[in-house]
């Protein structure tokens, strides 16, 4: 109801604006509304099948000043990091809440790592605690994912800090590609599912900032500063394509076109945002190819909305590819 009321107000205001600004205002409203549609499936019990060897670890993060909960399924020395969406919860990772990912990667020869928390974080190192929502520490997710957690897992779970895959959806799609851009030994494989792949361009900083504010009251200026700050480009996969090409990172990029199929997701925000996101994904593919990139899989099917069933379908589809690249298993089951 709150979302519908916001939309009515914004559609009324938009009539007074120029066309480009009208599109941005409506897009921002839908983006903020979609945060609830996609990620706000708060339930107390995660999806893991009973009997799977899923552990709940508390990994120290000196940079953030507290332990971070990790859902972990051991399966090999190489691992798949499954990153969450904008409304990441503090109890379980969204991949476990909304998909059978642990089951799908059981006996794959790969360990599965699901960090818990990080709402609106973009899994990035922020400048300061979020201003306006009372956050008492500074997000340092990049430090945690690339230094603190890998060291702990190597010492305690025999998971190597090199030769892993980062898989992200929506918010974390860009995060996965950025992690691979700057840490190629740790992440020779990165997958973005319906990710925002050019966040520093045009109206994206504004839309991202408003969506973050809607999802926990987080302040994008506390993350990367104003849109003119170099941190926005530093964390922009489109800008960092030369790094991905030079690293020869294996990338998997997926985005639907907003048309639902039998998997569902037939609601206005999910359809609109996926169609809005598709254009930056297509530009990313063209720019990647023009930059000499030859190690990517790009899936842009004639269907798919911004919702979990489509992302899970891609996670299953990429499993043999991940196994081959990471050499984590000869079993493609």
Curated annotation (Swiss-Prot):
SUPFAM superfamilies (alphabetical): alpha/beta-Hydrolases
InterPro entries: AB_hydrolase_fold, Esterase-like, Mycobacterial_A85_antigen
Catalytic reaction list: an acyl-CoA + a 1,2-diacyl-sn-glycerol = a triacyl-sn-glycerol + CoA; 2 alpha,alpha'-trehalose 6-mycolate = alpha,alpha'-trehalose 6,6'-bismycolate + alpha,alpha-trehalose
CC annotations in GO: extracellular region
Pfam family, one: Esterase
Enzyme class, first EC level, given as a word: transferase
E.C. code: 2.3.1.122, 2.3.1.20
Residue numbers annotated as active site: 170 (nucleophile), 274, 306
Subcellular location: Secreted
Span of the signal peptide: 1-44
Keyword match Acyltransferase: yes
Residues reported to bind substrate: 86-87, 170, 198, 276-279, 306-308
Keywords noted in UniProt: Acyltransferase, Secreted, Signal, Transferase
Residue ranges, annotated region (Fibronectin-binding): 102-112
GO molecular function, one term: trehalose O-mycolyltransferase activity
Subunit architecture: Homodimer.
Primary role: The antigen 85 proteins (FbpA, FbpB, FbpC) are responsible for the high affinity of mycobacteria to fibronectin, a large adhesive glycoprotein, which facilitates the attachment of M.tuberculosis to murine alveolar macrophages (AMs). They also help to maintain the integrity of the cell wall by catalyzing the transfer of mycolic acids to cell wall arabinogalactan and through the synthesis of alpha,alpha-trehalose dimycolate (TDM, cord factor).
Family as reported in the entry's similarity comment: Belongs to the mycobacterial A85 antigen family.
Protein's name according to its UniProt entry: Diacylglycerol acyltransferase/mycolyltransferase Ag85C
Provenance organism: Mycobacterium leprae (strain TN)
């Amino acid at each position: 109801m709150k979302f519908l009321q916001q939309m009515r107000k914004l559609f009324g205001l938009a009539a007074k604006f120029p066309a480009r600004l009208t599109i941005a205002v409506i897009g921002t409203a839908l983006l903020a509304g979609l945060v609830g549609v996609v990620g706000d499936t708060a339930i107390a019990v995660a999806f893991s099948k009973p009997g799977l060897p899923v552990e709940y670890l508390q990994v120290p993060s000196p940079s953030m000043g507290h332990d971070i909960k990790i859902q972990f399924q051991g399966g090999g020395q190489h691992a798949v990091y499954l990153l969450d969406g904008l409304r990441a919860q503090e109890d379980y990772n969204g991949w476990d809440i909304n998909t059978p990912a642990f089951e799908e990667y059981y006996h794959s020869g790969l360990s599965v790592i699901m960090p818990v928390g990080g709402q609106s974080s973009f899994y990035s190192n922020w400048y300061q605690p979020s201003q306006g929502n009372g956050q008492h520490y500074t997000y340092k997710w990049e430090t945690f994912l690339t230094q603190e957690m890998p060291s702990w897992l190597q010492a305690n779970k025999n998971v190597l800090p090199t030769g892993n895959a980062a898989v992200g959806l929506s918010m974390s799609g860009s995060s996965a590609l950025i992690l691979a851009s700057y840490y190629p030994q740790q992440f020779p494989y990165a997958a973005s599912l319906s990710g925002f792949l050019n966040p520093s361009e045009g109206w994206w900083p504004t839309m991202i900032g408003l969506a973050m504010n809607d999802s926990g009251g987080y302040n994008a200026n506390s993350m990367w500063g104003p849109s003119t700050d170099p941190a926005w480009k530093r964390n922009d996969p489109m800008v960092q394509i030369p790094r991905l090409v030079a690293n020869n990172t294996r990338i998997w990029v997926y985005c639907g076109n907003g048309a639902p199929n039998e998997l569902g997701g037939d609601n206005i925000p999910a359809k609109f945002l996926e169609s809005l996101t598709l254009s930056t994904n297509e530009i990313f593919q063209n720019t990647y190819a023009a930059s000499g990139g030859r190690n990517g899989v790009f899936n842009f099917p004639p269907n798919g909305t911004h919702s979990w069933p489509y992302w899970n379908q891609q996670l299953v589809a990429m499993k043999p590819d991940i196994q081959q690249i990471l050499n984590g298993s000869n079993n493609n089951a």
